[in-house]
Amino acid sequence: MQKVRTIEETREAVAAARAHGKVVGLVPTMGFLHEGHLSLIRVARDSGADFFVVSIFVNPKQFGPNEDLARYPRDEERDFALLEEESIDVLFMPSVETMYPPDVTTTVSVGPLARTLEGAHRPGHFDGVAVIVLKLFD
């Protein structure tokens, strides 16, 4: 498993895999992995992916004003061990500065749907999710 922290390293690994005819599967997470995350890797494998990128990024834009980003659970060593068992190829663990550089602003407005269900209690949550998913698929 290659552990990378930059967008450039991730793009290089994905480009090399594609150049060898690999089908890339991406599983975005915020870490503290559980069986649900691991099942997504297995579904990607069963769907034909043969090169796997998992991201671990605790996205500050997904947290509401009264939610404690600092208290979000993290256990990198456990996450590494679980991902090794799944034989993933690349683990992308960017910093906040990498994903949100000061000279670039990216926003996504999910619209009225973002104010229902979970969004009714967590303003900005779904917009934050949409931004990071957009960036990860870019």
PLM features per residue range, with description:
Residues 1-138:
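Nucleotidyltransferase catalytic core that binds NTPs
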